[in-house]
Amino acid sequence: MSKTPGIDMSSGSLGQGISAGVGMALGAKLLKKPFRTYVLLGDGESQEGQVWEAAFLAARYRLDNLTVILDYNGLQQFGWQKPGEHMLPPIENPTLKWQAFGWNTLEINGHNIHEFVSAIQASQQTQGKPTIIVAHTTKGKGVSFMEDQFDWHARVPTNDELATALDELGQTGLFQESMAGGQS
């Protein structure tokens, strides 16, 4: 828990993060601690039953100190979330599903920082229920060869690809040097 300040844990694609987040938020409530818990959740991992069990419990315990940010881009590690292409169907209409579980729901353009900040601030004002921010995003947005390409889920760019991507995003100099880590 000491490598990245404010980041207490990371989890894989099986939905464990939200369960841990619910536990942290519940612990804070029980101990009367004033902190908030934030969970990043992918739409692909929302196919896991554990996510919905945690969602139910968070609403049941009125965890208004919990904010989940759902990255809703339609892609998961091995492809698009389309009916018939996977064993599990995609999570359609996530806002309605989370509302049905008793959550406060906010929808934003996940690429708009102003909408993002406003949603975080709104989530902090919600009382009596947890909040989910459904952030509609495009995987790899702004990089021509990465945009909407599921194979970039876990792939590291080469130095040349990194340079091209940073150029397309308008990033140069020190940032580019600090991000280098791939192979040419």
Q: Language-model segments: what does each one mean?
A:
Residues 1-60:
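Cofactor-binding active-site loop characterized by glycine-rich and histidine/acidic residues
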Residues 33-36, 81-119, 170, 174-181:
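Conserved thiamine diphosphate
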Residues 35-39, 66, 129-135:
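Generic beta-sheet signal
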Residues 41-48, 72-75, 111-113, 139:
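Acidic, glycine-rich active-site loops and adjacent beta-strand->loop/helix elements
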Residues 50-52, 78-83, 118, 143-148:
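Short acidic, glycine/serine/threonine-rich loops at helix termini
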Residues 60-87, 92:
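A short, conserved beta-to-alpha structural element at the edge of catalytic cores
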Residues 113-184:
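Glycine/aspartate-rich loop-and-adjacent alpha/beta segment that forms the canonical ThDP
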